[in-house]
Curated annotation (Swiss-Prot):
<dbReference type="InterPro" id="IPR013020">
    <property type="entry name" value="Rad3/Chl1-like"/>
</dbReference>
<feature type="binding site">
    <location>
        <position position="255"/>
    </location>
    <ligand>
        <name>[4Fe-4S] cluster</name>
    </ligand>
</feature>
<dbReference type="InterPro" id="IPR027417">
    <property type="entry name" value="P-loop_NTPase"/>
</dbReference>
<keyword id="KW-0547">Nucleotide-binding</keyword>
<feature type="short sequence motif" description="DEAH box">
    <location>
        <begin position="362"/>
        <end position="365"/>
    </location>
</feature>
<keyword id="KW-0539">Nucleus</keyword>
<keyword id="KW-0378">Hydrolase</keyword>
<dbReference type="InterPro" id="IPR014013">
    <property type="entry name" value="Helic_SF1/SF2_ATP-bd_DinG/Rad3"/>
</dbReference>
<feature type="compositionally biased region" description="Low complexity">
    <location>
        <begin position="149"/>
        <end position="160"/>
    </location>
</feature>
<keyword id="KW-0408">Iron</keyword>
<dbReference type="GO" id="GO:0036297">
    <property type="term" value="P:interstrand cross-link repair"/>
</dbReference>
<dbReference type="InterPro" id="IPR010614">
    <property type="entry name" value="RAD3-like_helicase_DEAD"/>
</dbReference>
<dbReference type="GO" id="GO:0045005">
    <property type="term" value="P:DNA-templated DNA replication maintenance of fidelity"/>
</dbReference>
<keyword id="KW-0479">Metal-binding</keyword>
<keyword id="KW-0411">Iron-sulfur</keyword>
<comment type="function">
    <text>ATP-dependent DNA helicase important for chromosome transmission and normal cell cycle progression in G(2)/M. May have a role in changing DNA topology to allow the loading of proteins involved in maintaining sister chromatid cohesion in the vicinity of the centromeres. Has a specific role in chromosome segregation during meiosis II.</text>
</comment>
<dbReference type="GO" id="GO:0034085">
    <property type="term" value="P:establishment of sister chromatid cohesion"/>
</dbReference>
Length: 844
């Protein structure tokens, strides 16, 4: 544990630049969180160097306090003392000392090998600069040879074998006992042969030491790529040893087998990879121990991102997907996407050690929704109909060749699918819109209530039936008309249900069905099953996880410190109550000011328009023409003052579309467009919102300015930076509260109220807080990307009288709430805006 005074004045965090005061405060706070075993919640606005601060503070602590983890050895020593009380203590202590010395020696040998690789790589780089043509020619030749080898291994097959054999289910499945689960059942992609190979990778005396590490996770691979680039900025020489980093990713991102990586969907790619491990023509990149060792050491010797790991795998002809896993034990930083850390099955498959390690979750503003989404699944009526068609056709084709066990389970699955379809049809006939249901109500006919969904789900996992059926369906689709006639006949039969649509029966849906059955076979008490009907005749069933706390509990119990970070974490109450309610004494909140001076930001609350129409953009006032016309006049006034680009966020597409419709009818659109070209985000699936943003950006960059209309929660509200001229003003129309009539939202609210009652808290107050927090987190995320650097400036304009409530203003980020200008009338708002930009123009 560190001394608070020492941390308070600590300045050396190995930062590559001279850090600002707010960055020093951030790093000191994170350092303390790790040292004291806290759960940190860090808010650092976009543009304040958050990622680099996270890296520097955590690596500094690790360099000063971290070390080799000897947990396994110490446990072994404890076992010796428990089982053999006759062994003197001094013998046990000596044994532990020998083990520690051995680990240190192994660690030293690892560092020696890595240093030799670094020198060799530097020599290679020097040669490249001297003779780049030769190097590229050799690289190209190696890649061509690797592709040829891949093609030969994947396509070489025994021509005497019936092509149908590939799709026949042959797996033997027996219902496991409680104490005896198949080791390969939940291994998330490792075949037994690969698991054995990885277990036997090295003899004990050459196994790399397990070192204390930082698990750094974020939502997307691109965010993790950026993180690795930030780590590269650090000067290795200032640390006691060069930084060892490894990036874990999915097969889709790391596979170098060209015949496999092109497969879609991702589930097909995963299944093909596993299949090639056990086949006679195994993947040529799944190499033996020595080559895996080489990959591991090369990956640790230099800081590599995903693309560089793929290039390394191609150069060494070793699978990066499995090779990176061998580097985890000795890495100081492991970067990985959310699912690999937050799903238990993924952690077990990767054999990740949580105990005493440090966990940093970046871009954590949507962590609650992300965890719930990972452990939820849905299936639509159309998908169920397609699944029934495909399963019946598959069963007709292979029934006589299936053994009794497989025949029984496939018939059970068909029965379950039939019951799902019957449930949908009954809901459609009774015009049911939405409701919460229980699993038992889905399985009511033909003896389906006697089927053990848990065992059936396990059978699907072991047998790989979904891949077999999807593969067979694609194969049938590729054949001539004679084979297609039977499927087309089935299509006519299956889909002549009066619903006015036909669906292509060749669409792969069995993987989706398997995922859905897995969830309803193991329903968590904190989850709910819903029936939903939105538009048309394609309702869906959805299993939704309501309480994510169980999935972070193991992190807080085992990790030394868990730290959440984001540009806009406010309001943080939900993180505490929904994720860490039993760990509140460990919570360390931190929110820093923005890097820009206060005079570069103005926040204006607008309660009414120029005509005096009160601004309260509720759902029931969506069609209020007077309200929308006065909103248009407000924009006309504002954009006469605001230079360059203006971004406007609406609470929903329906609100945006209705506003544009009213403006077009009253000539407001033309008047707006005369001052600034208008760009409107579309809801249409075929339109790419990034194209809209690119056109807006081109207009602003060309000096024509622009006004971009977007939607909170849409593609343009996250991940895009509206810095400098792209966002001299960011406006938010209304407040994006969730739909209180939505059945899923009602279930979430009920769950929050139940939990509040259990803790003796006012239930209605808790649900109201949850309601407001959900809204304000979305608002904060949308407006948080306007300022990107110290010299940037922008106005934040919130158009709704409800923003004047003190309970709402408290949920704004600290850096934004310190300079709020509010008035009941429109005049002061326009004057404040003019004053702000007049001052900025004088500075320019």
């Amino acid at each position: 544990m560190c001394h608070s005074k020492e941390v308070k004045f600590k300045t050396n965090f190995h930062h590559p630049y001279t850090p600002y005061d707010i960055q020093l405060e951030f790093m000191r706070s994170l350092y303390s969180s790790i040292s004291d075993g806290k759960i940190g919640i860090f808010e650092s606005p976009t543009g304040t160097g958050k990622s680099l601060s996270l890296i520097c503070a955590s690596l500094t602590w690790l360099d000063e306090h971290g070390g080799v983890l000897l947990e396994d050895n110490e446990k072994s020593n404890d076992n010796k003392s428990n089982t053999s009380s006759k062994i003197p203590d001094w013998v046990l202590e000596q044994d532990l000392k020998i083990q520690k010395d051995l680990v240190k020696e192994t660690h030293a040998r690892l560092e020696q090998r890595l240093e030799e690789i670094r020198k060799r790589n530097q020599s290679r780089k020097n040669q490249m600069s001297n003779n780049s043509t030769t190097y590229h020619r050799e690289t190209k030749r190696r890649n061509i040879n690797a592709e040829a080898s891949t093609s030969d291994n994947c396509n070489n097959s025994n021509t005497s074998v019936d092509p149908m054999d590939e799709y026949l289910v042959t797996a033997e499945y027996t219902m496991p006992s409680t104490s005896e689960q198949s080791e390969d059942l939940f291994n998330n992609g490792y075949s037994s042969k690969v698991s054995e190979l990885l277990r036997k990778l090295s003899p004990d005396n050459e196994k790399p030491p397990i070192v204390q590490k930082i698990y750094f996770t974020s939502r997307t691979h691109s965010q993790l790529q950026q993180l690795v680039q930030e780590i590269k900025k650090l000067n290795n020489q200032t640390f006691s040893t060069p930084i060892r980093v490894v990036s874990l990713a999915s097969r889709k991102n790391l596979c170098i087998n060209n015949e496999v990586r092109k497969l879609r969907p991702t589930s097909a790619l995963n299944e093909k990879c596993i299949e090639l491990q056990g086949s006679a023509h195994k993947c040529p990149f799944l190499q033996d121990n020595t080559q895996l060792w080489d990959f591991r050491d090369e990956a640790l010797a230099e800081i590599m991102d995903i693309e560089e790991l793929v290039e390394l795998g191609q150069r060494l002809k070793v699978c990066p997907y499995y090779g990176t896993r061998e580097a985890v034990d000795s890495a100081q930083i492991v970067t990985l996407p959310y699912p690999l850390l937050l799903q238990e099955s993924a952690r077990n498959a990767l054999n990740l050690t949580l105990k005493d390690n440090i966990c940093i979750i970046d871009e954590a503003h949507n962590l609650i929704d992300a965890i719930c989404s990972m452990h939820s699944s849905s299936i639509s009526f159309r998908q169920v109909c397609i699944a029934e068609t495909q399963l019946q056709q598959y069963f007709l084709r292979f029934e006589k060749r299936l053994n009794g066990n497989n025949r029984m389970h496939i018939k059970q699955l068909i029965k379950v699918v039939y019951n799902l379809k019957s449930f949908f049809l009954n809901c459609l006939e009774t015009n049911t819109n939405s409701k919460v249901i229980n699993v038992d109500s889905l399985l009511v006919s033909n003896g389906a209530d006697q089927i053990n969904l848990h065992h059936l789900s396990e059978y699907l996992n072991v047998s790989k039936l979904a891949r077999k059926v999807d593969g067979y369906t694609k194969y049938m689709h590729s054949l001539g008309t004679q084979e297609l006639e039977s499927l087309n006949d089935l299509r006519s039969e299956r889909f002549s249900n009066g619903n006015g649509y036909e669906e292509d029966p060749y669409t792969p849906v069995l993987m989706q069905l398997e995922s859905f059955l897995l969830n309803i076979a193991n329903p968590a008490p904190e989850g709910k099953l819903f029936y939903e009907k939105q538009t048309g005749d394609n309702p869906y069933l959805k299993y939704l996880l309501l309480d994510p706390s169980k999935h972070v509990e193991i992190l807080t119990e085992q990790c030394r410190s868990v730290n959440l970070a984001g540009g806009t974490m406010s309001p943080i109450d939900d993180f505490i109550t929904l994720l860490f309610s039993d760990e509140q004494s460990r919570i360390l909140p931190f929110s820093c000011d923005h890097i820009v001076p206060p005079e570069n930001i103005t926040t204006i609350l607008v309660s009414q328009g120029p005509a005096g129409v009160p601004f309260e953009f509720t759902h029931k006032r969506k069609d209020d023409e007077n309200l929308l016309k006065d909103l248009g006049r407000t924009f006309q006034n504002f954009i006469s003052i605001i230079p360059d680009g203006v971004v406007v966020f609406f609470p929903s597409f329906a609100f945006l579309q209705q506003a544009v419709k009213v403006w077009e009818m009253n000539g407001i659109t033309n008047r707006l467009n005369a001052k600034k070209p208008l760009f409107i985000e579309s809801k249409d699936f075929g339109d790419n919102p990034l194209d809209t943003f690119e056109h807006y950006k081109q207009s602003v960059d060309a000096g024509l300015s622009g006004m971009l209309f977007s939607v909170i929660g849409g593609r343009l509200s996250e991940g895009i930076n509206f810095s400098d001229k792209l966002g001299r003003a960011v406006m938010v129309v209304g407040m994006p509260f969730p739909n209180s009539q939505d059945v899923e939202w009602q279930a979430k609210v009920s769950y929050v109220e139940e939990k509040a009652k259990e803790k003796g808290i006012n239930a209605k107050q808790a649900s109201q807080e949850f309601y407001e927090n959900t809204c304000m987190r979305a608002v904060n995320q949308s407006i948080g990307r306007a300022i990107r650097h110290r010299d940037d400036y922008a106005s934040i304009i919130l158009l709704d009288s409800r923003y004047n409530r003190s309970s709402i203003q408290r949920k704004l980020p600290n850096w934004l709430s310190k300079n709020i200008h509010s008035s009941p009338n429109f005049g002061p708002a326009i004057r404040q805006l003019a004053t702000f930009f007049r001052a900025k123009k004088m500075c320019d």
